[in-house]
């Protein structure tokens, strides 16, 4: 009887581990405590356009969605908790089209995040909304900013891949942790 309980427990553990590894909903560990909210290099405006990553050397882009926001993703964008992009050509397109108009408003309940990791191991993060009618970012520094190239960004987000590991650790290794 004791042997059956051990075998059953082991099989249950293996099944749960398999689900955790392959379901597309990893555990996300983030380090917010050392976030520098005052990086003046991010806030330059060119002709009323705000692009906080235009001059950054980006290694990867990570989208972390709240469970509620996953249901609101537009058609074609993979409905998973974490999407990632590390393809250089796609990152370059993204940098060129990640342009926003600052509205001066505030979006109250933005729970999803976009996280940019640079080649210098700096981390840039801000809250993001991606749904059928909107792409926008929300930060303490600039408030709500609406995407100027939403259609192009939708196409880029459709090419992001599902993060397949069970844990995602977002921490600046020897770099800085900043809000966009």
PLM region spans:
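Function-determining sites in protein domains
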Residues: 2-9, 16-180
């Amino acid at each position: 009887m004791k042997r059956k309980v051990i075998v059953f427990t082991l099989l249950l553990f293996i099944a749960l581990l398999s689900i955790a590894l392959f379901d597309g909903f990893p555990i996300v560990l983030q380090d917010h405590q050392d976030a520098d909210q005052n990086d003046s290099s991010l806030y330059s405006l060119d002709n009323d356009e705000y692009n906080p990553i235009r001059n950054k050397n980006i290694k990867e882009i990570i989208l972390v969605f709240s469970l509620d926001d996953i249901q609101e993703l537009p058609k074609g964008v993979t409905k998973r908790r974490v999407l990632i992009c590390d393809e250089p050509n796609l990152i370059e397109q993204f940098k060129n089209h990640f342009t926003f108009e600052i509205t001066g408003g505030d979006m109250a309940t933005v729970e999803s995040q976009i996280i940019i990791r640079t080649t210098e191991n700096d981390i840039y993060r801000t809250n993001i909304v991606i749904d059928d009618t909107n792409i926008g970012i929300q930060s303490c520094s600039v408030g709500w900013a609406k995407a100027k190239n939403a259609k192009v960004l939708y196409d880029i987000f459709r090419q992001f891949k599902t993060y397949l590991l069970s844990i995602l650790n977002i921490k600046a290794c020897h770099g800085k942790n900043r809000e966009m």
